[in-house]
């Protein structure tokens, strides 16, 4: 039972951190500032919540006695675990808590003392089972061992209250258990769980495992999900989606999911360089000012080891370019891709989708009926993926909108790393999943034909192999092929597809960099571009390739590429009189 304190809207530890943030703005990320203004302060002013200050203080004492002193920001975060609905105290105010911070900040060390406390009679919920979920066994065990090692080191006292082995810790009074789980999610459905702790959420490429564990919530009071993670290199996965939702909540939009996001991260690459700018001139480590890196690393000013590691990694990055992706993603939560591999950098892909990236405001589709257009078509096999797109050029803006068919009978479908289950949601409206042995070639052709009357289609571009599979249907509708004898034929077959990238890749690099590409809010298109690598041959020509051949598809992007090969047909001739 929750025992109420008279001061339900005040917590010293929360106020201390708010004051710290106010006095040290350079050390606080913009996201944390928004969290304080748009979530924390409004929550503290509500009269429909209970803040159980006594149990919270008991938690702090327990954790600091049996584990180690907590940093101020950790106490600040802990406090929100002890807020409940006034009318229904079995429900927590924040049923989902996301904590994003850089590597080395002690994520496990922060949350595991709290998890241990939640097992005890001080918290008072019987059978409050906590499941640690990680994609690797090593990660799951390391997290679990924070509590296991404490119990083992204090076994004389702790054996009165706990029993434990290498896979499970049980509190004798409450029967609450701490367990760890790995990627074999098939056997975990139906667990009665009070809290799920997802560790290193960035490693998940889809929701298959996540959904299995989440289904165990709702049977025990105070049900909650906690995500603690650095950023990573997986794009358009669950973490990107969670961060996007968090950004909306932080801006003050409706918080239907009762989500509390603590996003410790940097927003700009140049902020990292600011910390080291003077040092790079003087070579004197005293000239390194890491204050701004505290935005992604809240433990930085308390842990000298972390400071030294960040400095070492930054210097390593200066000498080893390939380390840039790892440093920016893991140390400051600023995703960056290996520039020697990806065709287009992620931040440029986002700018192609959104006119305001932070607020996720999609780019407009200002194309009138009758506008000149190019059709691009690409697919590997009709029993897999197939994409068709329309390319427009309005002044300097290159606009691309696609439609993609996905065959769910493909032997690779279940393992493809894209959240098809989101179909119909914003950003997931330009594809369809077909439940047939293969994609119907007629559907592809009919899709093209319906736009021939709407727009002035200058060319339909695809390579000769793809054309052979669509030829019969195109002929049925009298769509002719461009030849030497028929230069006005609508279909242009590309004889040597590999040669296209040599022409298109340099142009796309410039157009993406200049912000001239408009793909709209298309998660599948962003994913497709991000799945495409580019290599420079000995002759200096560039060639595109799939970064992962079977499971990371790039058909929508390659349809765009073939259409771009004839974009000159969209250049309007200006006649001066």
Locate each region found by the language model.
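Extracytoplasmic
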Residues: 508-517
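Short polybasic/polar patches that bind polyanions
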Residues: 64, 475, 513
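Active-site phosphate-binding and catalytic loops of NTP-dependent enzymes
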Residues: 154-158, 515, 571, 575
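RNase H-like, metal-dependent nuclease domains and their acidic two-metal-ion catalytic environment used
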Residues: 112, 141, 149-150, 170-174, ...
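Phosphate/NTP-binding elements of NTP-utilizing enzymes
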Residues: 2-377, 531
């Amino acid at each position: 039972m929750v025992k109420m304190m008279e001061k339900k809207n005040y917590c010293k530890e929360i106020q201390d951190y708010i004051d710290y943030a106010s006095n040290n703005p350079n050390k606080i990320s913009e996201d944390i500032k928004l969290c304080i203004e748009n979530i924390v302060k409004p929550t503290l002013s509500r009269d429909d919540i209970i803040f159980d200050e006594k149990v919270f203080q008991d938690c702090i004492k327990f954790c600091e006695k049996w584990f180690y002193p907590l940093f101020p920001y950790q106490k600040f975060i802990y406090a929100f675990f002890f807020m409940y609905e006034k009318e229904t105290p079995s429900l927590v105010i924040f049923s989902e808590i996301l904590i994003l911070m850089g590597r080395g900040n002690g994520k496990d060390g922060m949350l595991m003392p709290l998890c241990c406390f939640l097992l005890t009679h001080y918290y008072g919920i019987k059978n409050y089972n906590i499941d640690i979920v990680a994609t690797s066994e090593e990660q799951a065990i390391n997290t679990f061992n924070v509590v296991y090692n404490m119990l083992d080191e204090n076994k004389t006292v702790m054996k009165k209250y706990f029993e434990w082995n290498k896979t499970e810790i049980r509190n004798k009074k409450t029967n609450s258990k701490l367990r760890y789980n790995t990627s074999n999610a098939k056997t975990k459905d139906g667990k009665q769980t009070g809290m799920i702790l997802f560790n290193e959420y960035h490693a998940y490429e889809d929701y298959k495992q996540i959904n299995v564990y989440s289904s165990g919530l709702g049977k025990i009071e105070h049900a909650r999900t906690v995500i603690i993670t650095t950023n990573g290199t997986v794009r358009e996965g669950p973490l990107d989606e969670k961060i996007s939702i968090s950004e909306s909540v932080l801006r003050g939009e409706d918080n239907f999911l009762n989500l509390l996001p603590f996003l410790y991260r940097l927003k700009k690459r140049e902020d990292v360089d600011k910390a080291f700018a003077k040092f790079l001139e003087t070579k004197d480590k005293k000239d390194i000012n890491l204050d701004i890196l505290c935005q992604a690393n809240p433990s930085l000013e308390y842990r000298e080891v972390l400071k030294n590691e960040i400095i070492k990694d930054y210097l390593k990055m200066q000498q080893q370019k390939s380390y840039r992706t790892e440093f920016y993603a893991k140390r400051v939560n600023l995703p960056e891709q290996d520039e020697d591999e990806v065709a287009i950098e992620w931040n440029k892909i986002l700018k192609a989708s959104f006119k305001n990236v932070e607020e996720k405001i999609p780019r407009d589709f200002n194309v009138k009926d009758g506008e000149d257009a190019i059709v691009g078509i690409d697919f590997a096999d009709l029993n897999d993926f197939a994409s068709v797109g329309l390319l427009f050029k309005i002044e300097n803006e290159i606009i691309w909108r696609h439609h993609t068919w996905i065959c769910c009978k493909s032997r690779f479908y279940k393992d493809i790393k894209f959240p098809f289950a989101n179909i119909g949601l914003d950003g997931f409206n330009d594809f369809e999943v077909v439940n047939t042995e293969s994609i119907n070639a007629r559907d592809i052709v009919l899709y093209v034909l319906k736009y021939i009357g709407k727009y002035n289609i200058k060319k339909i571009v695809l390579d000769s192999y793809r054309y052979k599979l669509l030829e019969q249907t195109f002929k049925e509708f009298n769509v002719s092929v461009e030849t030497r004898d028929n230069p006005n034929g609508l279909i242009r077959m590309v004889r040597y597809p590999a040669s296209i990238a040599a022409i298109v890749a340099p142009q796309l690099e410039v157009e993406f960099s200049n912000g001239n590409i408009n793909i709209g809010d298309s998660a599948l298109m962003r994913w497709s571009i991000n799945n495409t690598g580019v290599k420079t041959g000995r002759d200096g020509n560039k060639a595109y390739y799939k970064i992962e051949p079977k499971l990371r598809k790039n058909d929508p992007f390659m349809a765009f590429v073939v259409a771009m090969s004839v974009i000159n047909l969209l250049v309007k001739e200006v006649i001066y009189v």
